[in-house]
From Swiss-Prot:
NCBIfam families: PRK00504.1, PRK00595.1, rpmG_bact. GO terms for cellular component: cytoplasm; ribonucleoprotein complex; ribosome. HAMAP family: Ribosomal_bL33 (MF_00294). This is Large ribosomal subunit protein bL33B. It comes from Exiguobacterium sibiricum (strain DSM 17290 / CCUG 55495 / CIP 109462 / JCM 13490 / 255-15). The keyword tRNA-binding does not apply. GO terms for molecular function: structural constituent of ribosome. Belongs to the bacterial ribosomal protein bL33 family. The keyword Ribosomal protein applies. One of its GO terms (biological process) is translation. Keywords: Ribonucleoprotein, Ribosomal protein.
Amino acid sequence: MRVKITLACTETGDRTYITKKNKRNNPERLELKKYNPRLRKHTLHREVK
């Protein structure tokens, strides 16, 4: 089952990105390096509830 998740920046806390993931294949929290427009650089974004 695919569910919508929100990705929050670890440096500023901004929630800029929304994506989907399969909870059966990836039960742990998703971490991706994404672009943060406020800082103008790539930062680590983590899945939040």
